[in-house]
Each structure stands twice: as C-alpha cells, then as structure tokens.
Amino acid sequence: MDREFIRNFSIIAHIDHGKSTLADRLLEVTGALSQREMMEQVLDSMDLERERGITIKAHAVRLNYRADDGKLYQLNLIDTPGHVDFSYEVSRSLQACEGALLVVDASQGVEAQTLANTYLALHHNLEIIPVINKIDLPAAEPERIREQIETVVGIDARDAVLCSAKQGVGIHDILEAIVHLVPPPKGSPDAPLRALIFDSWFDSYRGVIILMRIIDGRMKLGQKIKLMANGQVFEVEGLGYQAPKATACSELQAGEVGFLYANIKTVGDAKIGDTITEVENPATEPLPGFEEIKPMVFAGLYPVESHEHGLLRDALEKLRLNDSAFNFEPENSAALGFGFRCGFLGLLHLEIVQERLEREFNIDLITTAPGVRYRITDTSGNLVEVDNPTKFPDPSYIETIEEPIIDASVITREDFLGGILALLEEKRGTQKKFEHIGAGRVMLTYELPLNEIVLDFYDRLKSASKGYASLDYHLSGYRESPMVKLDVLVAGEPVDALSIIVHKDFAFERGKALISRLRKLIPKQMFEVALQAAIGNKIVARETISAMRKNVIAKCYGGDISRKRKLLEKQKEGKKRMKRVGRVEIPQEAFLSVLKVSQSSDDD
C-alpha cells in the first residue's frame, strides 16, 4: 500500500482509563472482527492481563478503514503496556508510531502515568490527539478535563475528541482524527532495510515471533536478515500482520507494521529496541535508542517443597523464553535450601512472574524480601555490584556504598497531602517540585531511594490517599548512602534469608520491629530461643521466646522445698542440654514478615 495511506498510532492511558475497551471499539467499527468474535479486551490475551485489567505485552493490529473522503487507509494500532515497570517497552512501541491517542478519563482527569507516557511520546515527536473517554459517566466533567490537559500536559485540547468507548460514542470521530492529524510514515522503500523490534514472544512451533515496524526498505520471505545488536543472521521463514488474527503475507515495506519468524531460538536474541537489517545490503547505522534492559528489583524465589527445585528451574526457563527482561541464577540458602535469585523490572513484574509460576506451573513459592542493586567501592578501589544481602562484603573492606535513586511524581488531591508528605518524608524523599494543577489536585516531584519503594510504598501511598494518588517513577542515577547489612540470628545462628540491607539511621528501628514480629511468628520450642538483630558484631535488638515447660513439681504435695528444687534443677539441666543441640524450625510466615517490617507497628 502507498505510504500516504498508512497511519501508525498507539494509545496512551493511565490504568483503568479505558484503553483496552477503546481498542475493542476501534476493531469493531473498522470490521476487523465480526460480532461473533467480539469479546471484552480482545488484545489482552493473557488471563492475568484481563484479571488485573492491565496490558503487559505490546500488540500490533492492522485495521482497514474507509474514511469520509472515500479513500481506504491502513491504520496500525500498537497497543502498549501502561505500567511504569514496562516503560522501556512503551518507549520502543512509541518509536514505531507517528501519532498517539491520549486517553483521559472524564471523571478522574490526568494521572501520573498518563503524564509520563505523554512526555515519552512528545520526546519521540509524535502527534498527540487528546481523547476524553467515559463521557457517559454521571461524574464526567469534560470541560474541566480539557482545561486540565492544557495546564498539566501543555497540549492544546480545544479539539479533544469526546467519546464513550463502552457505548461506542465518538469512535468515528477518533478514526477521522487519526486519518487527518497523524502524519504518514517517513522512510524510503528503496533504502537499505531497517526494522525496529518492539516486542517478541515465543511460539513452541515457530520459535521466536518478532513484532516490528519497518522504517526503511522492504522485507521479503526467504530474505537473510541480521540483528544489529548481536550480529546474528537468520533467514525469514514467515511474514505477516495481525488483523487481529495472524494473516500471512509475502512482503512488508517501509511504514508497515507486522511480524516475522525466522527459527530464532530464544527471546534474548531478539532484544526489544534492536534493529533488523538485511545481510546483502546492510544499513550503516542502527536505529537510535536501543539499550539493554537492566533489572531493577531482585528477590529470591524458593520452592516450598525442596524436591520441586527442578520443576521451578524448568518453569523459570519457560518464562524467560517470553520475557527477556527477566533473569535468574541459582542460589543456595542455609535456611531455605536451593532456589533462584531473580531480577525484575519492578514490583508489578515481580508479582506477575510469581503469580504465573503459581498459576500456570502449580509451584508453591517462598519469596524473600525484594531488594535493589548497590554499587560498592572496596578499600582497594574495585567497584562491585551487589543485589543480594548474602554477598554484602565485610564492612571493614567497604570504602563507599551507592544506592539507586529514582525521580517519582505523585498526583493527588489536596485533602490527602498531609499523609502523603509524611510518607515521602519517612521514605527519605527530598522534594524537588510542588505544583497545583487545578481542581484541588497537586503534583509532587520527589527524589527517593529505590530501596524504599520496593517493599510497601505503593500500598501505603494508596491507603494514605484513599486510592486517589497515582505514581510514576524512573531511575535517575546513584547516590552515596550509609547502608548496612542487618542480620537476624535465631538461637545464635544467622538466618541468611532474613538478612536485609537498610540505611544506617533506620537500622535500629527496623531490627527491633523485625525481631518483635518474628517473636510472634516462631512457635515456642522445648528450650529458650534468643532472637537477635545484628549489624556486624553489634547486637541492636533482642527478644527471647520462652521455653514450653512441664510442671515437674505438680506431684509433690507439701514436703521439703529441697525435693522440689532438685526436680526443677534437673529440668533446667535437661533444657540446657537441649538448647545446645536443638534446631529451630522457622515457619514460612517469618520470611514474609520481613516484607512487612517497614509498615507502622500499630497494625500489629
């Protein structure tokens, strides 16, 4: 098809602002699916995506639309994940487009996520079409939202399209706006081939299937292609596009979006953001913006039943086939046995992987407290990266420790400011910006350590704001901080899986809170058990679990005190001997308690 009639666009929206429903309506109106095949959220094919109401993987669907001017246009809708964990995938999907629909809920207004993705879209010079959705709601205030889009996002919203995706109102106007406002793709079909990979997944019959947008040149069946990041060469075995069912074709050219498979074995080979070129006539430079995705959050995953270790490894291998951002390596813990140290993009990613393991592979898991990657310079000047408390070096060898810092923006209502500011303060945040964005809403920009966010920040932010605050963050760099490793000793033995890395100023309180929580969770033994929190050799907190004891003097009626004393001394001697050889079983809840330590102690 002539490039003049191709439009590539994506939909930007905050979670729950109606992005997937709008995509459904666009498919329905353009006749991509018959009534019989329509179901809610056609593009969210994973069960988890539907249940949580989020989009995890990107999709690309071709719609054929005959506009009011009588011409037939090819619209490529590239559906992007909306969550902050997947922001790199979003930026690559946006790079494949020339325009974006900015969908805002008519009752809720602009949220932090919408803002972050809009800035990404502006960064890629996309044409942004504001769409105000859910105008059928009784609480809808389209005029107020128009002003808000102009003040907060800074784009002209006078011509914003009003629609209700649920009732199918205004869909025609959106399609017309795409045709008239989004520019056709640039790039020449005669230049050397350059195609951008913006998603890939694994198919057990065809290997890796790559979703791509052809920027320059053309791609044909049987052509030899090369991936520019790692230099690997493959032969194109299949080409096609989703409409939304996969439809095969023999050639794709500049401006078009489609998929290819070429007997690629792992998703790790076809990295998101990489450039595909041809072997015969290669492009001189790759497309800009490619970076290796680095995990930001780390946690240990262990099977509850130790014999399921092999099953867990197979399950993780299968997940990695589809998720190149997820990585893992085996680790061994004295307390939990064999398991894996896994790296994730963020907390949502961690939850999704955990849930998929439990749901699709039926494995019961113990997850250790999530942590982040620290940079440590030792006394001899070497730089090491540590993401596991057990690998934390001896304090005497450490010169400096740097922790990852994020820039977070929070949008909330003024009524909840007090609680949110207190929470940000408690999490060692420094305020960078504070602005009113109209209609009683405030936007806060803070610099926070990533370490403080990974435990329970999001949940507490939601409770402090009764669910009204929205959060977006991105990594901004590293900063030197006095971090220490807090060890937990149970009956004098350190339990590696309970160790955490904390800021020196909070180590005492954290240690105290953790020990008092463990005391409630570890059952009484036949002997006295000491629980201690230690930093290096210094004990900062201690609790004692008293022993269960039998009343040995119950059978003595009256009589001499020395008889009773003899029995009590005998019992004491036995308990002492037991304490020397006894082992304490730590229940699974105890490991989960580490996660809850930073919550205020009043909810105990």
From Swiss-Prot:
PROSITE patterns linked to this entry: G_TR_2
EC number(s) on file: 3.6.5.n1
UniProt-listed GO biological process terms: positive regulation of translation
SUPFAM superfamilies attached to this UniProt entry: EF-G C-terminal domain-like (SSF54980), P-loop containing nucleoside triphosphate hydrolases (SSF52540), Translation proteins (SSF50447)
Gene Ontology annotations for the cellular component aspect, listed alphabetically: plasma membrane
Keyword Transmembrane: no
Subcellular location: Cell inner membrane
Domain named tr-type G: residues: 4-186
Record protein name field: Elongation factor 4
Organism: Solibacter usitatus (strain Ellin6076)
Gene, per the UniProt record: lepA
